[in-house]
C-alpha cells in the first residue's frame, strides 16, 4: 500500500527563523491533536533541551549511518554547520495509523518531502514585513549582530524560494499569532475533511 494513499495527514510547516512557526505548530497540535515529528540533528544540545523530545541528538557519524540506511524522509545541512533530518519510520507509522503528524522543517526539507509524499499538506509562515522579521530576530536576544544579519539574509532567501515555486499549499502571514493559529487550524481541518471524503 502506498504511503500517499494513507488516511493520515502529514502537515509540513515552514518559515524563516523568527516568524513564529514553531509556536504555531505547537498550538495547532494542542487544538487538533496529532504527533510532532522529532528531527535528528548533529548540533549540540542546549541545557534546556531534552533528547528525544526537542530533537534526537546524534553524532555526525551516526547521522551519516542513518542517512546511508535511508532512515530519513528528508535531510539537510543548515547554516553550513549542522545536519538535520526527519526520521522516516515514525512518520510512516503515524500515517498508517491515520494520525495527523506535524513537521517543522525548512524549504530544502519540504522539497524532499513533496517528492516522496505528494499528498503532504504544506503551509509556509510569512512575516508581516522584512522590518518586523528583523525586529523579531533582534528581540530574541540569542545572537550577536553578525549572526542576526546571517539569519536575516537566510530568511530572505528562504522566503524568495518558497514564494517562487508551487511547493506550498497555503501561505499564512503571522501578523497576529492567534489569527495565524486559527487560520492554520482551519486549513488543516478542511484538508483532513477533504481527505476523509475521498477515502
PLM region descriptions:
Residues 1-10:
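Extreme N-terminal, non-catalytic leader segments
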Residues 4, 135, 142-143, 160-199:
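NTP-dependent small-molecule kinase module
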Residues 14-16:
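P-loop (Walker A) phosphate-binding loop of NTP-binding proteins
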Residues 24-25:
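Post-Walker A alpha-helix
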Residues 30-38:
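Post-Walker A helix-loop "phosphate-sensing" segment adjacent to the P-loop in P-loop NTPases
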Residues 41-101:
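ATP-dependent small-molecule kinase phosphotransfer cores
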Residues 101-106, 116-139:
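Conserved phosphate-donor/acceptor-positioning beta-strand/loop module used by diverse small-molecule
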Amino acid at each position: 500500500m502506498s504511503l500517499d494513499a494513507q488516511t493520515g495527514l502529514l502537515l509540513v510547516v515552514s518559515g524563516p527563523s523568527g516568524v513564529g512557526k514553531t509556536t504555531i505548530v505547537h498550538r495547532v497540535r494542542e487544538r487538533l491533536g496529532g504527533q510532532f515529528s522529532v528531527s535528528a540533528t548533529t548540533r549540540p544540545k542546549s541545557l534546556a533541551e531534552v533528547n528525544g523530545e526537542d530533537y534526537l541528538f546524534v553524532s555526525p557519524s551516526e547521522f551519516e549511518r542513518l542517512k546511508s540506511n535511508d532512515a530519513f524522509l528528508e535531510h539537510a545541512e543548515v547554516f553550513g554547520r549542522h545536519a538535520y533530518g526527519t526520521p522516516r519510520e515514525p512518520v510512516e507509522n503515524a500515517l498508517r495509523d491515520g494520525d495527523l503528524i506535524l513537521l517543522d522543517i525548512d524549504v530544502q526539507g519540504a522539497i524532499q518531502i513533496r517528492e516522496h509524499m505528494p499528498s503532504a499538506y504544506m503551509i509556509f509562515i510569512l512575516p508581516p514585513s522584512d522590518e518586523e522579521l528583523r525586529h523579531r530576530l533582534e528581540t530574541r536576544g540569542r545572537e550577536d549582530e553578525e549572526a542576526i544579519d546571517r539569519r536575516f539574509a537566510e530568511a530572505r532567501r528562504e522566503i524568495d524560494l518558497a514564494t517562487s515555486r508551487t511547493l506550498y499549499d497555503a501561505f499564512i502571514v503571522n501578523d497576529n499569532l492567534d489569527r495565524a493559529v486559527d487560520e492554520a487550524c482551519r486549513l488543516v481541518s478542511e484538508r483532513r475533511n477533504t481527505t476523509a471524503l475521498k477515502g
